[in-house]
């Protein structure tokens, strides 16, 4: 079995065998040159130091894992009791990929994240990004039922 982190920061740290330094931005302690060194060795591709190019390289590598995975395992920001829906908030789109491309999706979360109805969810979804990153809303809000 191969486990692959899909959050970009966590993916970089997994490749580097390095612990996270921040809960929201886990690889913030690494320079782009350090990330480039890791990608060159682990991806076995020519070294790049341009950030858009490195992001594209990571997307290409991760997409291969998404489409061949038998199972995607994620957390959930919220679960709706009324519908059985899971809600995942990301800024990279990895939540949608891990919940839809693998044959099986397993969401693991605590009871404190269960909300009664979709209406209750609408209130909480506006609060989450403001308190986590200061954003009005995250780039990707994925609800899966």
Predicted regions and their residues:
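The feature marks the mature, well-folded catalytic cores of soluble enzymes
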Residues: 1-145
């Amino acid at each position: 079995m191969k486990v692959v982190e899909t959050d970009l920061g966590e993916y970089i740290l997994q490749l580097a065998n390095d612990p996270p330094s921040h809960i929201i931005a886990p690889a913030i302690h690494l320079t782009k040159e350090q990330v480039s060194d890791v990608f060159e060795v682990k991806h076995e591709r020519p070294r790049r130091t341009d950030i858009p190019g490195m992001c594209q390289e990571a997307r290409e590598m991760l997409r291969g894992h998404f489409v061949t995975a038998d199972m995607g395992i994620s957390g959930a920001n919220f679960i709706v009791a009324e519908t059985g829906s899971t809600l995942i908030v990301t800024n990279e789109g990895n939540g949608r990929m891990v919940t839809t491309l693998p044959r099986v999706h397993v969401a693991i979360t605590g009871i404190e994240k269960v909300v009664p109805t979709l209406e209750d969810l609408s209130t909480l979804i506006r609060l989450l990004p403001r308190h986590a990153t200061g954003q009005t809303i995250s780039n990707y809000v994925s609800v899966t039922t």
